[in-house]
From Swiss-Prot:
GO terms for cellular component: endoplasmic reticulum membrane; membrane. It comes from Pan troglodytes. The keyword Magnesium applies. FAD binds at residues 9-13, 32, 40-41, 61-62. Belongs to the FMO family. This is Dimethylaniline monooxygenase [N-oxide-forming] 2. It is found in: Microsome membrane; Endoplasmic reticulum membrane. NADP(+) binds at residues 60-61, 195-198. Catalyzes the oxidative metabolism of numerous xenobiotics, including mainly therapeutic drugs and insecticides that contain a soft nucleophile, most commonly nitrogen and sulfur and participates to their bioactivation. GO terms for molecular function: flavin adenine dinucleotide binding; N,N-dimethylaniline monooxygenase activity; NADP binding. There is a cross-link at residue 492 (Glycyl lysine isopeptide (Lys-Gly) (interchain with G-Cter in SUMO)). Pfam families: FMO-like.
């Protein structure tokens, strides 16, 4: 008899968890509090309690080839970085392809998840839900929590003396939808993460002036990398990941600093991070430098105090006649349907084995999916988490002892602090490729490079030096997909397809030109050595 699994949430993590349950022969039921799938990526004009809310212009910071699910590439005509509506379209295609909607109960809120009396032997859970004012309860063999971590808006008003006197408008960035109504205003955006930067750039087109306050500074990256390819397809390779792991920390940090400053000098723009050697997640924004050059945005230090109409900053400067303050200060998360003894959230931190399993339970039948911030795409990360979790639920994979898991949690947290610092916004941060490989190893889906060097050297080279995308984890092991190898070799075609909207007469001239340059360079070298010999 198939084990019954409750999946809480029908966003990215919930959808892929449903598919993984079905793939493993489990019987899932998904509870989604709203009327549709998509989670944080589904734009709505109104703000809903307990749900993150995006602005209309949001696009992805990770590219389509690095963000698609491992056996379902995005259509080749999709742009590399997707508008939220386009990403939602992909989710709908995915859900239809694998017939996932039939497992979802919409407009159903999970009120509580409690252990059954015989949990120590059965591992079962009693799940109480509410829909249309009626409560229902059911028993499940396992639970996958997929409600995400963009839940409660974090507005630290106590850190801003005088906010109660401020006569203008102030609100959290989740309430911002579009620039209408902010024309001619003097606006202060507090917080320079991705949302704060996006909002500041968008408002600066029609506002009188936009200021952005950053406590520690930040690195700003372009989505466009070497030769015009998406940044993550260049940055996230196993070769580069290996270098970052084996080289001395000082060398790695120096390399990162050089890479970040290659686009523009962050010190000159007042953006250089206070602690350059903490690997804080960079801001992905192609417009910030130009808006700073135009003077449309001005970078400010931490706000020290607010008056009725002005902002006083820690460096002693004052900006008068502020009309609007937008707090782009992130989110905190909680699980109101779980007891603290199950998953305790403290200072925006949770103690979970590999960011997934509570270590202290008698039975490993509760898991959190997507409660992590990788330095890369969340989509393949959540997928590998779900693939592992469903195999644990089915009894095909096992977890180590509680003591071993607790030691891993402590060690992982120490490493996280060392790499990313102790900021509340970095509590879920982790390296990308390393974490994916770690999960893949648990289910036997990590490619064996030594073996591939002999069996398929061309593929081995692609895996090691090319983009580390999700297809790699469908080459071997459970859930092997026969289309994985082809997807790896055709990814460049899908990257370039949406860009080649203008037909060129003949691209062969480029090859000839390149060859002539090489021959010319060789001629110069030969001439140089000949001259040395004659002299």
């Amino acid at each position: 008899m198939a084990k019954k699994v409750a999946v809480i949430g029908a966003g990215v993590s919930g959808l892929i968890s449903l598919k993984c349950c079905v793939d493993e022969g489990l019987e899932p039921t998904c509870f989604e509090r709203t009327e549709d799938i998509g989670g944080v990526w589904r734009f709505k004009e109104n703000v809903e309690d307990g749900r993150a809310s995006i602005y209309q212009s949001v696009i992805t910071n990770t590219s389509k080839e690095m963000s698609c699910f491992s056996d379902f590439p995005m259509p080749e005509d999709f742009p590399n970085f997707l508008h939220n509506s386009k990403l939602l379209e992909y989710f709908r295609i995915f859900a239809k392809k694998f017939d996932l909607l039939k497992y979802i109960q919409f407009q159903t809120t999970v009120l509580s998840v409690r252990k059954c009396p015989d949990f120590s032997s059965s591992g079962q859970w009693k799940v109480v839900t509410q829909s249309n004012g009626k409560e229902q309860s059911a028993v499940f063999d396992a639970v996958m929590v997929c409600s995400g971590h963009h839940i409660l808006p974090h507005i630290p008003l106590k850190s801003f003396p005088g906010i109660e006197r401020f006569k203008g408008q102030y609100f959290h960035s989740r309430q911002y939808k579009h620039p209408d109504g902010f024309e001619g205003k003097r606006i202060l955006v507090i917080g320079m993460g991705n949302s704060g930067s996006d909002i500041a750039v968008e408002l600066s087109k029609n506002a009188a002036q936009v200021f952005i306050s950053t406590r520690h500074g930040t690195w700003v990256m372009s989505r466009i990398s070497e030769d015009g390819y998406p940044w993550d397809s260049v940055f996230h390779t196993r070769f580069r990941s290996m270098l970052r792991n084996v080289l001395p920390r000082t060398a790695v940090k120096w390399m990162i600093e050089q890479q970040m400053n290659r686009w523009f000098n962050h010190e000159n723009y007042g953006l250089e991070p206070q602690n350059k050697y903490i690997m804080k997640e960079p801001v992905l924004n192609d417009d910030v430098p130009s808006r700073l050059l135009c003077g449309a945005i001005k970078v400010k230090s931490t706000v020290k105090e607010l008056t009725e109409t002005s902002a006083i900053f820690e460096d002693g400067t004052v900006e008068e006649n502020i009309d609007v303050i937008i707090f782009a200060t992130g989110y905190s998360f909680s699980f109101p349907f779980l007891e603290d003894s199950l998953v305790k959230v403290e200072n925006n931190m949770v103690s979970l084995y590999k960011y997934i399993f509570p270590a202290h339970l008698d039975k490993s039948t509760l898991a959190c999916i997507g409660l992590i911030q990788p330095l890369g795409s969340i989509f393949p990360t959540a997928e590998l988490q779900a693939r592992w979790v469903t195999r644990v639920f089915k009894g095909l994979c096992s977890l180590p002892s509680e003591r071993t898991m607790m030691m891993d949690i402590i060690k992982r947290n120490e490493k996280r602090i060392d790499l990313f610092g102790e900021s509340q916004s970095q509590t879920l941060q982790t390296n990308y490729v390393d974490y994916l490989d770690e999960l893949a190893l648990e289910i036997g889906a990590k490619p064996d490079f030594c073996s591939l060097l002999f069996k398929d050297p061309k593929l081995a080279v692609r895996l090691y030096f090319g983009p580390c995308n999700s297809y790699q984890y469908r080459l071997v092991g459970p859930g092997q997909w026969e289309g994985a190898r082809n997807a790896i070799f055709t990814q460049k075609q899908r990257i370039l397809k949406p860009l080649k909207t203008r037909a060129l007469k003949d691209s062969s001239n480029f090859s000839v030109s390149f060859l002539l340059k090489i021959l010319g360079l060789l001629a110069v070298v030969v001439a140089f050595f000949c001259q040395l010999q004659w002299s």
